[in-house]
Amino acid sequence: MDKHRKLIRLQNFDYSSSGAYFVTICTKNRKPFFGEIIGNKMILNRIGDAACDYWQETPKHFSNIDTDEFIVMPNHIHGIVIIEPQHADVGTPYMVSLRKNRFGNNVKGSLSSIVQQYKSAITRWCGKNGFHTFKWQSRFYDHVIRTETDLKAIREYIVNNPMNWKADEYHG
């Protein structure tokens, strides 16, 4: 790993803590493996269908997560992951604590482990179905959702993403 790479995670943040997270997962070199935008609508191909199905199945593989709004785009996926409290917490479900994770971010049930398992599942599916050139970008982008206003704006961004494809930073 390049020690000079820009850190994209919040330092000393516990990414296994309950709250809502907006993630963007890109294909390697932003290659359009999932389909194409036609008439402001995302038209999924077989890999895109699998990516969509697997995203919807993700909560079945973790006892404390749910997914919210998401979209599979030609070369990336935007989605909201909600990590539920493991115990009886009092508070707003979309507010995220700033407690520190002393052991790093790749712990079971953390955002990184959820995304890694999702990416692995799609990669395995592609290999089994003859799509051997499929590859992910090695990392992913996240945003900690701290308020209901933030959540609403992100949901709107996700829903409108196909209509804004030509202006999207991920458009090739």
Q: What residue spans do the PLM features occupy?
A:
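Short catalytic/metal-binding and nucleic-acid-binding patches
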Residues: 1-172
